[in-house]
Amino acid sequence: MLFTFTDEIKVIFVKDTMEEIINGLLIVLVPMVLGYLVKIQNQNALAFINKIVMLLLYVILFMMGFMLGQLEHLEQKLPIIVMTALGLSAIILTCNILGLAIYDRTLPKPVNYLQGELPSRWHSLMDSIKLLSAVIIGIVLGWLCNDWLHFPHGSNLYVLIALIFFVGIQLRNNGISLKEVLLNKQGLIMGAIFTLSSLIGGVISAFFLSMPITQGLAFSSGFGWYSLSSVVLTNAWGPMQGSIAFFNDLSREILSLFLIPLFMQHYRSTAIGITGATALDCTLPIIQKSGGIEVTPIAISFGMVTNLLPPLLLVFFSSFPI
């Protein structure tokens, strides 16, 4: 059989794609592993690291907004970004709820009643609004400074590397036994159901929103980790796609604040699962207060799955051109 020019092009494409995937995984996973190796016992140092993580998060979101503000014909593209993100969020979240609710009905679990006072959902909502404000400020300044100020290409990636390194330090020093988390069967099953239902939602979204399937799968792979998905997709496809990913994943966090108490009493897996990657951080206090202390290992096990998979899935799906 002759080796045609078309075959050669396919080989080159596959090789370049694999190199992009490997490089992307190294960029994301290496700093997390290095951070996880750092053991810190000083509580003041840990508190300082927590502040650094929040600062870097605001910087990343501001930079993403700044680059979005410098898009040509922004006034025409912004409504498309918001409407696309809302469509993605509605479809993917619906698939998550259906999949996890079926699991809840098949394997019902006892649930503790509400323990203590719920953390203020309005306080958590204000935190989300602050993050959104960083993007909006970036958009305005990017639009105003478009003629004379531009960030170097890929500069937001270096900020992301620093952020992931410090997140790795946080994971290493969270005080939860790794054995307790890894051996939690329910959390792992929930993670698998959540991942599968999210990807199904991505395919359905691609069909209804008239986008390539790989793009729909990429948008569904953020799992609520907006600081990661927005940067990865911005660098892969541009600030417009990165902004869609941001609004899609941020909406999961905001909606979770209200849906967790609503589902926890009768649909515990659903209540935990809709949070996605945020189960390890901002929504964990609400999960614990709504479902009792025994749901904490489940949430952390689930959160580990939904924090480990997004880098792999995002890098893989975003390596395909659109």
Regions found by a protein language model. Give the residues of each.
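Juxtamembrane boundary at the C-terminal end of a transmembrane helix
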Residues: 309-322
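Alpha-helical membrane segments and immediately flanking helix-loop junctions
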Residues: 65, 70, 215-255, 263-301
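Entry/N-cap segments of selected transmembrane alpha helices
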Residues: 20-32, 75-98, 127, 131, ...
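Structural signature of hydrophobic alpha-helical transmembrane segments
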Residues: 19-32, 53-54, 84-95, 152-166, ...
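Transmembrane alpha-helices that form the ion-translocation and gating core
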Residues: 32-38, 84-114, 189-233, 251-264
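Hydrophobic transmembrane alpha-helices of secondary-active transporters
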Residues: 30-38, 53-77, 137-142, 157-180, ...
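Interfacial helix-loop-helix linkers and transmembrane-helix boundary segments
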Residues: 42-53, 69-85, 107-125, 148-154, ...
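Intrinsically disordered, low-complexity non-transmembrane regions of multi-pass membrane transporters
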Residues: 2-18, 42-49, 100-136, 281
